[in-house]
Amino acid sequence: MLECFESSPVAVAVGVSLLVLLLLCGIGCAWHWNRRESTPFTLPKFMQRRSSRQKDVTKTVSSSAYVISPSMKASVESKGHKSTAKRNKMHGNYENVEVCPPCTEGTTEKALYENTQPSNLEEHVYGNQTDPLYYNFQKPSPPPPQDDDIYILPDCD
């Protein structure tokens, strides 16, 4: 395939243009890496992590001469942002959670976690035995034997 382009001017032009393109790409990459070391690359705010955004905010606040007083801070919070204390109160109130002081008696916890009943060695631990305390189930028994043999005769017309 390349034999037809060996001595033609088209092959020389294509080769030179590819070399120039490769040279431009190399210069662009070198410029990008040198520039990247001097100034850090910053992502847009929606792509940054929250922790890095907070670090950026603290850097900008400390470098600026503008100081926020506590009264101004309260007005900023009331504009549209909820404070963390309010958020924690909201998440702490669940409907189905019983709130009471912790139990000091160790006997109730012991009864919950320890099996104090003596073990029955004849009990089948891994078998398919049903316990009558939990199930109202009767094991199927074979049907009673029939005394008479029943024969079904076809109809004769």
Curated annotation (Swiss-Prot):
* UniProtKB keywords: B-cell activation, Cell membrane, Membrane, Transmembrane, Transmembrane helix
Where does the entry say this protein is expressed, by tissue?
Expressed primarily in B220+ splenocytes and total bone marrow cells. Expressed at lower levels in mast cells and dendritic cells. Not detected in T-cells and macrophages (at protein level).
Biological processes, Gene Ontology terms: B cell homeostasis; B cell proliferation involved in immune response
Reported phenotype of the disruption mutant: Mice are normal in appearance, size and fertility. In aged mice, the number of MZ B-cells is increased, and serum concentrations of IgM, IgG2b, and IgG3 are elevated.
Q: Which residue ranges have biased composition labelled Acidic residues?
A: 146-157
Task: Kindly list any coiled-coil regions of this protein.
Answer: none
Q: Does the keyword Cytoplasm apply?
A: no
Q: Cellular component per GO?
A: Golgi apparatus; plasma membrane
Give the residue ranges for region: Disordered.
117-157
Q: What does this protein do?
A: Negatively regulates B-cell proliferation following stimulation through the B-cell receptor. May play an important role in maintenance of marginal zone (MZ) B-cells.
Report the protein name in the record. Protein GAPT
Lineage of producing organism: Eukaryota, Metazoa, Chordata, Craniata, Vertebrata
